[in-house]
Amino acid sequence: MEAAADGSAETQSPVEKDSPAKTQSPAQDTSTVSRNSADTGKVLALPEHTKKPKGYLPAESVKILRDWMYKHRFKAYPSEEEKQMLSEKTNLSLSQISNWFINARRRILPDMLKRHGNDPNIGHETGKDAHATHLQSTDASVPAKSGPSGPENVQSLPVWPLPKGQMSGEKLPDPESAPSQNPTVIAQPKKKVKVSVTSPSSPEPVPPEEYPDFSSFQLLVDAAVQRAAELELEKKQEPNP
């Protein structure tokens, strides 16, 4: 009997020892799984909290920048000193101010200029375009000053006195047709110069560009005077009857 009891105890002891472990293992597994899931949930939730919210600049800073742009709307390009000054007023970095002005010149500035009656194309005209328009305006003003003379300008010319030949009604030779019809007329000014050198009483030579050539008329006058002098001399030499 004792041997049988010992045998039953030996047979039951392993089962009794193993049964609590088997009954406790599912609870431990569920607890570990819940802990792991909670940890993973925390890990997954961390990036959402660590992401920086995509917000805008403060309203006060934007107002300061817009006021500055309105004052300098015809040249909305702040210098480094002005950017530093705006950075101190708005508590923004220089890169934020530069980016804001880049976007504002494309989106805010055209509307701002149109509201105040200024076209953005005229306000932001480049240096080359302005120089080209200045040259066009100067070129347009030059012909107005040095244009062809009209009838009004011809009437305002000074009136020169007419030569003696025209006042007496004598027909003067045409200077344009004279060289082609009579080639010897070209040598007449030379004769006139010689006569003026030898005889001091002859009139001074007149350039052919200013007045027409009157050398033939002068020769006729000299010949008539000489003939009259000869006739008078002959009368004096004749004996009285």
UniProtKB/Swiss-Prot annotation:
InterPro entries: HD (IPR001356), Homeodomain-like_sf (IPR009057), KN_HD (IPR008422), TALE_homeobox (IPR050224). GO terms for biological process: regulation of DNA-templated transcription. Residues 48-111 bind DNA. It comes from the Eukaryota. Residues 1-56, 115-213 are annotated as: Disordered. Residues 21-39 have a biased composition (Polar residues). SUPFAM superfamilies: Homeodomain-like (SSF46689). It is found in: Nucleus. GO terms for molecular function: DNA binding. It holds the Pfam family Homeobox_KN. Keywords: DNA-binding, Homeobox, Nucleus, Transcription, Transcription regulation. CDD domains: homeodomain (cd00086). GO terms for cellular component: nucleus. May have a transcription role in testis. Belongs to the TALE/TGIF homeobox family. This is Homeobox protein TGIF2LX. It comes from Hylobates lar (Lar gibbon).
